[in-house]
C-alpha cells in the first residue's frame, strides 16, 4: 500500500461551514434608512395619505392606479382624476371612457377604470360613500387586494397594519429578517415579529429605499449605509 497516498489523504483539509447569520437589527436598519431617504421623493401614495380631505378615499384611488405603474405616471393620473372628481359619487357619475381618458398613462388603464368605477359604486351602495376601515370590508371592493387595503388602513385611517409590496418583500429577505416566498407570507411573518412601532412606516421606508438604492437589479451596495448590517442574501450582482 502506498503510505504517501495515505498521508496525502490524511492531510486533506475540510472547508469551514458557514454558520447561521446573527439576528438582524431591524430597528437600527430602519433608522439608517429613515435618514438616507430624506433626499429622495416619497412614494405618491404616501403623499396622498396626507390629503386633508377624505385621505382614505384618496389613498384608495391612488393605490389602485399605482399597481404595476411608475410613481411619475401614478402621480399624474391621480392628479388628473381627482381634479375632475374627488368623491365616490363624482367618480361613479363619470362614464368609464371618461375615467380611461383621465388615467391613460397608467398600466392596465382600462381594467383600472372599470375597477375604480365599480369600487366607487360599492362605496356608495354599501358604505354611504365612506371608505371602510377594516381589511374584510376593503377586500370586498373591486380591484382591491391586501397591499391596497393595508395602505388605506395605515395611511388613510392611521390604524395599525403592515403593507408589503415587492420592494418590502425583497429587501427583508435580502436582510435575512424573514425567509418567505411571497409578499403575503412576508406580511404574516412581520405581524409575528416586527415591533409595532414600525408597522405603518416600513412600507414607505423600504419602497423609497428600494426604488433609489436597493434596486431589484444590481443594487447600489457601494453607497449603502447598511453595509455592515446587511448579509446581502441572494444578491448575485451589485454596484
Which residues make up each language-model segment?
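Short Lys/Arg-rich cationic patches that frequently serve as NLS/NoLS or arginine-rich RNA/DNA-binding motifs
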Residues: 1-18
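Catalytic cores of DNA base-excision repair glycosylases
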Residues: 13-239
Amino acid at each position: 500500500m502506498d503510505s504517501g497516498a495515505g498521508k496525502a489523504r490524511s492531510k486533506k483539509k475540510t472547508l469551514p461551514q458557514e454558520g447561521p447569520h446573527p439576528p438582524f437589527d431591524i430597528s437600527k436598519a430602519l433608522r439608517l434608512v429613515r435618514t438616507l431617504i430624506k433626499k429622495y421623493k416619497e412614494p405618491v401614495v404616501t403623499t396622498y395619505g396626507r390629503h386633508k380631505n377624505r385621505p382614505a378615499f384618496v389613498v384608495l384611488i391612488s393605490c389602485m392606479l399605482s399597481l404595476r405603474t411608475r410613481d411619475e405616471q401614478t402621480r399624474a393620473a391621480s392628479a388628473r382624476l381627482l381634479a375632475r372628481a374627488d368623491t365616490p359619487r363624482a367618480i361613479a357619475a363619470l362614464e368609464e371612457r371618461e375615467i380611461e381618458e383621465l388615467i391613460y398613462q397608467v398600466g392596465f388603464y382600462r381594467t383600472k377604470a372599470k375597477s375604480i368605477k365599480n369600487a366607487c359604486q360599492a362605496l356608495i351602495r354599501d358604505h354611504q360613500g365612506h371608505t371602510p376601515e377594516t381589511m374584510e370590508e376593503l377586500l370586498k371592493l373591486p380591484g382591491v387586494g391586501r397591499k391596497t387595503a393595508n395602505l388605506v388602513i395605515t395611511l388613510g385611517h392611521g390604524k395599525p397594519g403592515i403593507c408589503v409590496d415587492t420592494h418590502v418583500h425583497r429587501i427583508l429577505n435580502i436582510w435575512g429578517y424573514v425567509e418567505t416566498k411571497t409578499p403575503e407570507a412576508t406580511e404574516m411573518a412581520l405581524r409575528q415579529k416586527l415591533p409595532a412601532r414600525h408597522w405603518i412606516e416600513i412600507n414607505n421606508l423600504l419602497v423609497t429605499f428600494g426604488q433609489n438604492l436597493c434596486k431589484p437589479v444590481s443594487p447600489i451596495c457601494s453607497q449603502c449605509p447598511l453595509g455592515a448590517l446587511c448579509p446581502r442574501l441572494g444578491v448575485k450582482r451589485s454596484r
